[in-house]
UniProtKB/Swiss-Prot annotation:
Keyword Cytoplasm: no
Active site: K11, D135
Alphabetic keyword roster: ATP-binding, Isoprene biosynthesis, Kinase, Nucleotide-binding, Transferase
Family stated for the protein in its record: Belongs to the GHMP kinase family. IspE subfamily.
UniProt: ATP binding residues: P93, F94, G95, A96, G97, L98, G99, G100, G101, S102, S103
Protein name: 4-diphosphocytidyl-2-C-methyl-D-erythritol kinase
Class in the EC hierarchy, top level: transferase
EC number assigned by the record: 2.7.1.148
Gene3D superfamilies for this protein: 3.30.230.10, GHMP kinase, C-terminal domain
An MF annotation (GO) of this entry: ATP binding
Alphabetized HAMAP family for the sequence: IspE
GO biological process, any: terpenoid biosynthetic process
Metabolic or biological pathway: Isoprenoid biosynthesis; isopentenyl diphosphate biosynthesis via DXP pathway; isopentenyl diphosphate from 1-deoxy-D-xylulose 5-phosphate: step 3/6
Length: 286
C-alpha cells in the first residue's frame, strides 16, 4: 500500500498527580489517560524523502515537528532508505494538554511501519516513542483508559471506557508545558490515592463520590494565571456536569455528563465562543 490515511485521537487526563522531580529534571506522575473523539487526520504517501504539509500554518513542519522526528527516528532505527510525504489535517488544538502532537507522532510510527512494510518489535517501538515524548506510548499502544506512571511511559491497560459523555473546551489560549511544570504548587510529600482502583469504581459502579480524588496538580496555577480557563471551568461546573477538570497542563477543560442531552446543551452553549468537542460515552480509539 503506497497511500493511506489514519486518525490520531486526542486524550484527557482523569487526575494528574505529580509525585517527584528526577535528577535529570523530568517529573514523575500518576494519571489516567482517556481517549476522546477529537482527532487529526494524517495522510501518508511513499516518496523518496521525508516531507510534511500541515493545514495549520502556525505549526512548524521542520525537524522540530514530532511527526518528522518520528519518521526520521524510525528510518534511523531500521535502516529504511524510503521516505514519505505526510499531510496533516490539524483539528486538535495544540498547547491544550490534549496530546495532539504526541498522538500524531504515534500515528506516524504505526503508519510508516505499514507503508514501508517493516516489522518492528513492539518493545523497540515503545523505546522510540518514549524518546519522542512521554505521552506518545499511550497513543501507540492503548485504545481505552490506561493508568500511567513514571514520566507517563509506564502504562497499564485498564480495559475500560468512560461511561460518561465528554465535552472538551479549548479556551483559545495555549499553556506552555514547561511553564506549568515550573510554576505548579509542589506537594511531593503526600499520600497518592490508588487511581486504578478508584477509576474502576467509577466505571463499574458509577460511584461518583470518588471524583474528588481525581485532582490535577496543574489546575490551581493555570486557573490563577489564565482567567479565561477558569471562566470555562466555572461555566462547565454550572452546566450540570458530574465532574469538571483541566486536561494535562491545560489549557483545555473537560466535563463529564451522565445524560447526552445535558452534554449537548453544554456543548452548544460553549461553542458560541470556543472550539469544543463532544465525545460519546464508551468511546475507544480504533
Amino acid at each position: 500500500m503506497k497511500h493511506f490515511s489514519v486518525k490520531a485521537c486526542a486524550k484527557i487526563n482523569l487526575g494528574l498527580l505529580i509525585t517527584s522531580r528526577r535528577a535529570d529534571g523530568y517529573h514523575t506522575l500518576e494519571t489516567i489517560f482517556a481517549p476522546i473523539d477529537w482527532f487529526d487526520t494524517l495522510e501518508f504517501t511513499e516518496s523518496d524523502a521525508i516531507s510534511m504539509e500541515c493545514s495549520n500554518l502556525d505549526l512548524l513542519v521542520d525537524d522540530s515537528n514530532l511527526c518528522i522526528r518520528a519518521a526520521k527516528a524510525l528510518q534511523e532505527h531500521t535502516g529504511v532508505k524510503r521516505g514519505a510525504t505526510i499531510k496533516l489535517l490539524k483539528r486538535v488544538p495544540f498547547g491544550a494538554g490534549l496530546g495532539g502532537g504526541s498522538s500524531d507522532a504515534a500515528a506516524t510510527l504505526n503508519a510508516l511501519c505499514k507503508l514501508w512494510q517493516i516489522d518492528v518489535p513492539s518493545a523497540e517501538l515503545h523505546k522510540l516513542a518514549v524518546k519522542l515524548g512521554a505521552d506518545v506510548p499511550y497513543f501507540l499502544e492503548m485504545k481505552g483508559l490506561a493508568y500511567a506512571a513514571g514520566i507517563g511511559e509506564e502504562l497499564e491497560d485498564l480495559n475500560l471506557a468512560l461511561p460518561w459523555h465528554v465535552v472538551t473546551v479549548f479556551p483559545e489560549v495555549q499553556v506552555p508545558t514547561a511553564w506549568a511544570y515550573k510554576n505548579f504548587h509542589r506537594q511531593f510529600e503526600r499520600p497518592v490515592p490508588d487511581l486504578k482502583t478508584l477509576v474502576r469504581r467509577l466505571c463499574h459502579e458509577r460511584d461518583i463520590s470518588v471524583f474528588g480524588v481525581f485532582e490535577n496538580d496543574f489546575a490551581s496555577v493555570v486557573f490563577e494565571h489564565y482567567p479565561v480557563v477558569r471562566e470555562v471551568r466555572d461555566a462547565l461546573a454550572a452546566s450540570g456536569a458530574q465532574f469538571v477538570s483541566l486536561s494535562g497542563s491545560g489549557s483545555a477543560v473537560y466535563a463529564l455528563y451522565e445524560g447526552r442531552a445535558d452534554a449537548v446543551k453544554a456543548a452548544e452553549a460553549m461553542s458560541a465562543r470556543f472550539r469544543i468537542n463532544m465525545t460519546p460515552a464508551g468511546f475507544r480509539m480504533e
